[in-house]
């Protein structure tokens, strides 16, 4: 089956198509799935995607925010999204800024988000 890679900046997509997508690195190793998208209401932009990784059957997994610009999206020949590709090793993800499911970071404070963007080498949109 032919696949197409789409950059996150290359168009518009329904957020419900992104949530639940499997995430893997270019080696094909599973990095979890997209749990949610955090929205910056003041700016009207997506702050980051939240990845769940490391648990078993949803138990004990840690949540990792990742800037959308760090993903590529893989679509099948019909254009349906199949997976997100994140160009990191598993250890890089394990050492990324993250949090437990019940301990959401203070999203109004950009200090945490800045650490996330720096970890992935992404330019924060609020510094444009």
Identify what each model region corresponds to.
Residues 1-128:
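Peripheral interaction segments used for macromolecular assembly
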């Amino acid at each position: 089956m032919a696949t197409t890679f789409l950059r996150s900046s290359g168009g518009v997509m329904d957020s419900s198509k992104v949530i639940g997508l499997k995430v893997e690195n270019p080696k094909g190793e599973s990095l979890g799935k997209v749990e949610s998208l955090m929205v910056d209401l003041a700016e009207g932009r997506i702050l980051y995607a939240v990845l769940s990784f490391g648990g078993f059957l949803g138990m004990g997994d840690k949540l990792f925010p990742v800037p959308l610009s760090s993903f590529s999206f893989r679509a099948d020949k019909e254009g349906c999204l199949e997976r997100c590709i994140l160009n990191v090793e598993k250890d890089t993800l394990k050492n990324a800024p993250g949090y437990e499911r019940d301990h959401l970071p203070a999203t109004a404070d950009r200090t945490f988000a800045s650490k996330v963007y720096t970890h992935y080498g992404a330019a924060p949109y609020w510094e444009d």
